[in-house]
Amino acid sequence: THCISSAASDVYKRQVSHYKNHNPKIKFILALTKNSRKYCFEEKMKELDNLSIFYDDTKNVLSASDFSIIASGTATLEAALCKTPMFVIYKTNFLSYFILSRLIYSKFISLPNILSEKKIVKELLQSQVNFNNLVYELDILMNEDNKEMKLNFENLHRSLINDNQSKFFSVIESI
């Protein structure tokens, strides 16, 4: 089982279709919140029989997934705490990205990387979020054991417990 979290688009649909044709055993899960534009996702994805949609159940979806593609800030931390290997995608309109990139001073965009102060998960931004890159990164996740990533997730989890969340809040404030 595999999780695509948050916003779905034609790129996701193409990717799910690709894996249906090339590896029919793979099942995708789309984890959404009730606040998401439910009708958009259901309409776009309805003919994909290798995709299930779940609402407001991110933790269980991530726990059941072998790996994930995450497009939500808090879901990246949830996936790390569930020790679910992932890569992160962020794509927004150009103006929003331009403004945010000038306001936020961080080398990373995902919470696991920010809190670890190093790259532990791959981040794809803006134009990097395309079909070829998603297939490439997902193939890497599927074909590696991801031990180092899981070890980094364990270390992050321990550091959040041991630092009594002070590190979490200080890093977030510095952004």
Predicted regions located by residue number:
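Single conserved hydrophobic/aromatic residue that forms the stacking wall/gate
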Residues: 1-12
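A conserved nucleotide-sugar
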Residues: 16-33
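Glycine-rich phosphate-binding loops of nucleotide-dependent enzymes
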Residues: 33-40, 69
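Nucleotide-activated donor-binding/catalytic signature segment of Leloir-type glycosyltransferases, i.e.
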Residues: 41-57
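A donor-sugar binding/catalytic signature common to diverse glycosyltransferases
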Residues: 55-103
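A short, well-ordered alpha-helix in the C-terminal region of glycosyltransferases
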Residues: 147-159
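C-terminal alpha-helical cap of glycosyltransferases
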Residues: 161-175
